[in-house]
């Protein structure tokens, strides 16, 4: 039987890795490779070797979409597990909205995550959306 199809949204994921030691140049390189200016959100896994102040400032200056970033002991790069550098992932879709929340210190993370999830569920109920759509 002939069935009408409805177009679905496409999720585009781009991955990049840099070993550039200068935070500003590393973030600029990743932003270009990830096409971050058009992304719905960006995830960054950063080596603890970067000074966090300059790294955070470079991210805020360069990537103007929501970013979730963390330090990591190592990242999966083009050559497998690597130490140093930054690995990034950009996600782009008309159906995706990313809302980062600071979880600090991490020992408070669980209770903060529960509070955030409850607030998102409350907002979803108020706007008659499913919680999964809001949390996604």
Predicted regions and their residues:
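Cofactor- and metal-binding active-site motifs of prokaryotic enzymes
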Residues: 3-136
